[in-house]
Curated annotation (Swiss-Prot):
This is Inactive lipoate--protein ligase 2. It comes from Plasmodium falciparum (isolate 3D7). Changing residue 276 to A: No effect on lipoylation of BCKDH-E2/BCDH and KDH in the presence of LipL1. The gene is LipL2. One of its GO terms (cellular component) is mitochondrion. One of its GO terms (biological process) is protein modification process. Its main location: mitochondrion.
Length: 384
């Protein structure tokens, strides 16, 4: 395992252990990084994602392309401290899309204050979500060149991510036709069952009601994205558990909503992703393990079919954060180790550099919707 100490090692990577003989010489070498931030508060996750997205967009053009898959299991319980870990006893927060207003989405600001719920404005579009140990977050930060066969827009990115990253049942039949031995997708890599689908810009539970002769559509995952010249970010919040009473106390039924919602109340519109998962996925951590396996097969397939690019799938373990360093290690081409100083450098470079002046869009908000300092809410942090 290599230790990453500076920004260049991520954004302009050198690969000393690469066997060039195994790669066609005319192929450009790229890296897709996997980072698990399950012990982070969502606020720091969003700051990290925004920093990686903007820095990648500005610094990797014409050089090695890089990308990131970032996961956060907010359901994970942490009852004790190990080393320098921060323990978040209160991760409750409402996250608003970049254009959303508190008055249009928050039902009762007094309830927010009394229950010590933090308010966050994120750097991407989309709707408003409530996080309280109830969601599995998956983010993709990728160069536009990652997808060679079609142009990705905000209007089609959910369809693309569904078909490319998540529709594993379809890919079993499509990809193994090319090379069964090198591309051995099997049932161990299936993430979802037949009820998982997409509709408009959401991931949904889709079924047919035989009695009433109508299609049932319930939201199981919300998506948001941001596009820049060279990169896009697409993140998903999968609903693991639904506390409808708490949602009703906090979130309004928004005036701007997808057509298929049809003004349904939260309890009639939102559904746990668990109804859409393959039979052997019982926990968010198992989902993450399956996702890692599946992404590795996606990269293998991409390397077989892409004549110009070769992608490595590497993991960045965060020192004192990722306890199980060797978990799923066989699915990564390489594993790096980094400490919080590196993340702090990444954020500070983005937050303070003149290259990104006034670009930052992720902030804490007060009850009136005004931007406040990163220390406004009393939560422990890793790199702020």
């Amino acid at each position: 395992m290599r230790i990453i100490k500076c920004l260049d090692q991520i954004f302009r990577p050198v690969l000393p252990n690469v066997n060039i003989n195994n790669i066609q010489k005319n192929k450009k070498i790229n890296i897709l990084y996997f980072i698990d931030v399950s012990k982070f508060h969502v606020f720091e996750q969003l700051l990290l994602e925004e920093s990686l997205f903007r820095i990648s967009n500005n610094t990797t053009e014409g050089l090695n392309n890089i990308g990131f898959v970032i996961v956060n299991n907010t359901c994970e319980e942490m009852n004790e401290s190990k080393g320098n870990e921060c323990i978040f006893n209160n991760k409750k927060c409402v996250i608003l899309g970049i254009s959303n207003k508190i008055k249009d989405h928050i039902k009762d600001t007094n309830y927010i204050k009394e229950n010590k719920i933090s308010l966050i404005k994120r750097f991407t579009g989309g709707g408003t979500i409530y996080i309280n140990k109830n969601s599995l977050l998956v983010s993709l930060i990728l160069p536009h060149k990652f997808e060679k066969n079609k142009k990705i827009y905000p209007s089609n990115i959910t369809e693309w991510s569904y078909n490319y990253f998540y529709n594993t049942s379809k890919q079993i039949y499509d990809k193994t036709q090319i090379n069964n031995e090198k591309n051995s997708l099997n049932k161990n890599h299936i993430l979802f069952n037949q009820y998982f689908n997409y509709y408009e810009n959401d991931y949904v539970y889709k079924d047919y009601d035989e009695h009433n002769k109508n299609i049932i559509l319930k939201k199981v995952g919300g998506n948001a994205q941001s596009f820049a010249r060279n990169y896009f970010v697409h993140h998903t919040s999968y609903i693991w558990t639904c506390d409808y009473k708490e949602m009703n106390n906090i979130l309004l039924n928004p005036s701007k909503q997808p057509i298929y919602r049809n003004k349904r109340k939260h309890q009639h519109f939102l559904q746990s992703i668990k109804l859409c998962l393959h039979d052997d996925i019982h926990t968010p951590n198992i989902f993450i393990e399956k996702l890692i396996k599946h992404i590795k097969h996606i990269i293998n397939y991409k390397n077989i079919t892409d004549q110009h690019d070769y992608w490595f799938f590497n993991k960045i373990n965060l020192k004192n954060i990722n306890d199980h360093i060797l978990r799923n290690s066989e699915h990564f081409d390489d594993i790096y180790v980094a400490d919080m100083n590196l993340l702090q450098c990444i954020f500070n470079y983005y937050n303070n550099s003149s290259l990104f002046n006034n670009m930052r869009s992720t902030y804490f908000l007060d009850l009136e919707g005004k931007k406040v300092s990163d220390r406004y809410y009393d939560i422990p942090t890793y790199f702020l």
